[in-house]
């Protein structure tokens, strides 16, 4: 309860334990009491509307998850095993490691940090420690934005062959990193100052830029696959074909799996939808870059680049 005395209209904002904000307009002097009442009787069934889909109480509060727990643990275990094997192969071929693979290692670190912060956010989201929640959420948003733009930079550079079959000019890498840092700085300021219009513009641009990057990369890879000269080893052609197939699969499967996940969420079990979403996120964000840049192909690519350079020198 609270008291208000004044001549003009005022706004009182309160917060409950679930971090849901309520706004009450006040234009009269007096004492006020704010309370909440349940919309259903104890034991009654209710359906919660989430993103247009009706989810029953049993789907959300069912403690007997059973097989879903084992599937989630197995999924996470498979991710850790895959990443451990990939990092081990990087260490094994450390003498001929490519710059693109170093970028992937940095990207994996950002992805792991991002997932850790997401777990911290889920821990505080239903608690009263809203300050810690806001801090975790702000850091999570910045790291997620940084990770996403590093991923797009990696896609473009791989399609152009930088750090793989072509050397990376220093100015090009510095420009790319500078652009990413500048975008992250503006995005952070918009979040810190609560300038939501700027963050919404950034989100809108991201939805438009991401498909354009994929289409450009696929078209450039098609050109690369059809322009392999006679002096180049077949390993380069195989590498670009493998990259092209992975790019096309990710670009085509992303909207289809998103639609499938929404159908499962609304009609079957939301936990299955979460597992499918996590699995595809791992495939797109981790397995895809690790697959096209697997360190076991480094020796063949390095030999191929030397052969091509020697052939060009002989022609001159």
Swiss-Prot record:
InterPro entries: 5TM-prot_SCHPO. Its main location: endoplasmic reticulum. Belongs to the UPF0742 family. It is found in: Endoplasmic reticulum; Membrane. Residues 92, 192-194, 267-316 are lumenal. The keyword Nucleus does not apply. It comes from the Eukaryota. GO terms for cellular component: endoplasmic reticulum; membrane. Residues 1-70, 114-170, 216-245 are cytoplasmic. Keywords: Endoplasmic reticulum, Membrane, Transmembrane, Transmembrane helix. This is Uncharacterized membrane protein SPAC977.01. The chain crosses the membrane at residues 71-91, 93-113, 171-191, 195-215, 246-266. The lineage of its organism: Eukaryota, Fungi, Dikarya, Ascomycota, Taphrinomycotina.
């Amino acid at each position: 309860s609270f008291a208000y005395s004044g001549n003009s209209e005022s706004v009182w904002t309160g917060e409950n334990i679930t971090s849901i904000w309520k706004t009450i307009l006040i234009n009269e002097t007096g004492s006020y009491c704010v309370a909440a009442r349940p919309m259903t009787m104890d034991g009654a069934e209710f359906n919660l509307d989430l993103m247009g889909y009706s989810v029953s109480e049993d789907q959300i509060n069912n403690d007997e998850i059973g097989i879903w727990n084992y599937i989630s643990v197995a999924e996470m275990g498979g991710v850790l095993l895959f990443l451990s094997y990939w990092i081990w192969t990087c260490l094994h071929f450390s003498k001929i490691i490519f710059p693109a693979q170093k970028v992937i290692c940095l990207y994996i670190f950002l992805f792991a940090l991002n997932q850790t912060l997401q777990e911290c956010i889920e821990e505080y989201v239903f608690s009263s420690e809203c300050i810690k929640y806001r801090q975790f959420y702000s850091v999570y948003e910045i790291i997620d934005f940084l990770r996403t733009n590093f991923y797009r930079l990696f896609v473009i550079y791989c399609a152009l062959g930088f750090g793989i079959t072509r050397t990376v000019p220093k100015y090009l890498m510095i420009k790319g990193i500078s652009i990413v840092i500048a975008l992250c700085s503006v995005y952070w300021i918009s979040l810190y100052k609560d300038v939501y219009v700027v963050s919404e513009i950034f989100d809108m641009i991201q939805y438009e830029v991401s498909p354009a990057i994929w289409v450009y990369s696929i078209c450039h890879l098609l050109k690369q696959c059809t322009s392999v000269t006679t002096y180049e080893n077949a390993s380069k052609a195989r590498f670009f074909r493998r990259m092209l197939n992975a790019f096309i699969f990710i670009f085509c499967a992303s909207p289809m799996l998103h639609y499938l996940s929404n159908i499962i969420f609304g009609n079957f079990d939301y936990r299955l939808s979460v597992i499918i979403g996590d699995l595809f996120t791992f495939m797109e964000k981790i397995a895809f870059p690790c697959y096209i840049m697997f360190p076991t192909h480094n020796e063949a690519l390095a030999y191929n680049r030397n052969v091509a350079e020697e052939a060009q020198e002989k022609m001159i």
